[in-house]
Amino acid sequence: MKSMIAVLLLALVATSMAGYLGLGYGGLYGAYGGLYGAGVPVGRAVAYSSSIRHPGFGGLGVLGGYGGYGYGLGLGAYGYGGYGLGYGLGLGLGHGKIW
């Protein structure tokens, strides 16, 4: 579980940094959509395979996503990719529930 959280945080930082490095509006909105779309089924698969059934995990993913989003903005960029990944994984892990 700890390694999964570490990988998620690394992904959030990486996608936020991608915004900082100047991938542009279109690419970041695309990353948001793609990561959000991939995050939901991946989160659900992890939740079911590891017997994580508590909706609260959705909140963790959403908060992680906001962290990536805020980090991107703080650097003068747009971390929509990190937001999408955290939100999608959060919804998946929470079985569609945010809290």
Swiss-Prot record:
- Give the family, as the similarity comment puts it: Belongs to the non-disulfide-bridged peptide (NDBP) superfamily.
A Gene Ontology cellular component where this protein is annotated is:
extracellular region
Q: Where does the entry say this protein is expressed, by tissue?
A: Expressed by the venom gland.
Q: What is this protein called?
A: Glycine-rich protein
> Which N-terminal residues, if any, form the signal peptide?
1-18
Name the UniProt key words of this record, in alphabetical order.
Secreted, Signal
In this entry, which stretches build a coiled coil? none
The answer to whether keyword Signal applies is: yes
| Places the protein is found | Secreted
Q: Give the originating organism.
A: Lychas mucronatus (Chinese swimming scorpion)
